[in-house]
Amino acid sequence: MNLKEYIPVVPNWPKPGVNFLDISGITINPLAMSYCVERLVKCITDNDITSIVAVDSRGFLFAGAAGIQSATPVVLARKKGKLPGECYSHTYATEYSTDTVELQKNSVLGARPLIMDDLLATGGTILAVNYLIKQNFTVESVFAAVVINLKFLPGEKQLADHSILLTSIVNYE
């Protein structure tokens, strides 16, 4: 299945000069969504993943579905102030500004967590979540899975430089 057919490009959004790849074309099509989730589940089972760390907010869509199908727990990585209880927190630079991501201190990740998001561009968000995981939890390896990988941007290399093993479903060269 060519998922690029289901990903419309929205020019000049969220700011001028940015061509936004809209994953809602996948989420509104059950066949495309199912195909995507099957690929993510394969990544989970092939790598003996112990938990999925879902990135706020579009990562939740894919992580929830993949978690159910693979019987893998889903932990939420959210923007600052969105999680109850005590949290670990890390501020990082994004493509457009700075942001803060948090994980609950009582999260159970296991030895092989998988960070899941909709899109990889510069890698900032996944690297921030990776930082939180490695600073605060005991893990063997950290993996990442994204629906869309913008290979012309430095994200994939940034993840490799931090020993994060990446699976991507749709690649844009």
Model-derived features: positions:
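PRPP-associated nucleotide enzymes
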Residues: M1-E173
